[in-house]
Amino acid sequence: MNPFPLVVAEFRRNWLGSAAVIALIATAVALGVALSAQEGALRQASARAADRFDLVVGAPGGPTQLILTTVYLQPAALDLLPAAVLERLQGTPGAVSVAPVAVADSYDGHPVVGTTADFATDGGRIAVVDGRRFSRADEALVGSAVGLPVGTRLRPAHGSPAENIIESHEHGHAFTVVGRLAATASPWDRAIIVPIEGVWAMHDQSLGERDVESPAALGPPWQSGRIGPVPAIVV
């Protein structure tokens, strides 16, 4: 028996209800496909953001928050590693790269991240599309999604008032934007990246104001007694 004539007859008899059922089925299928595609894209973006974080060293505590803050730049008040840990790690045989990462400040809703120029550019794999890398402790790179042109002077605020993580106040130390990084499709596209020495100077740790304009003051390697505590170290 051929069922198609019955289906056609039923559709003609109640075409409005049949069309509604077809539309609902099509919408459900489309939503399922869209959600699956979004989930896949989110997984890929998350994996891509974590590609260069082979090993993250932090103080004892919550490893999940350490990763969320260091890799995905979610603001949080992390415990600090003593300077001796960074000093010891940078002298470890086989450690190709040792990069401190400090996410504690913000500017105009963008996280201000202290690290090294090599880590900011992933060893040169992330291009500087406008300007150059920072070479002084009072200079900054911006991610592709930060709307600050090269030459902008900015003063970060300690904390993140939008998240109510820690009390916010503006620092007296200013940075000049000297370059813009290519897009990476990661949270770091929204970051303002400064030398870790600039972060230490802002917080009066290890590097004095007299050294912020000296290219020789930027590490690695960092001299003993010239290292401040950091929330995380990427090895």
Task: Say what each PLM segment does.
Residues H169-A174, R180-V235:
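Mechanotransmission and gating elements of multispan inner-membrane complexes involved in transport
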Residues M1-V33:
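N-terminal Sec/SRP start-transfer signal
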Residues A59, L81, G114-T115, V142, ...:
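A conserved hydrophobic position in a structured secondary element of the catalytic/binding core
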Residues G32-P111, T121, R136, W222-Q223:
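Hydrophobic, regular-secondary-structure patches
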Residues R52, P93, Y107-H110, T115, ...:
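Extracytoplasmic
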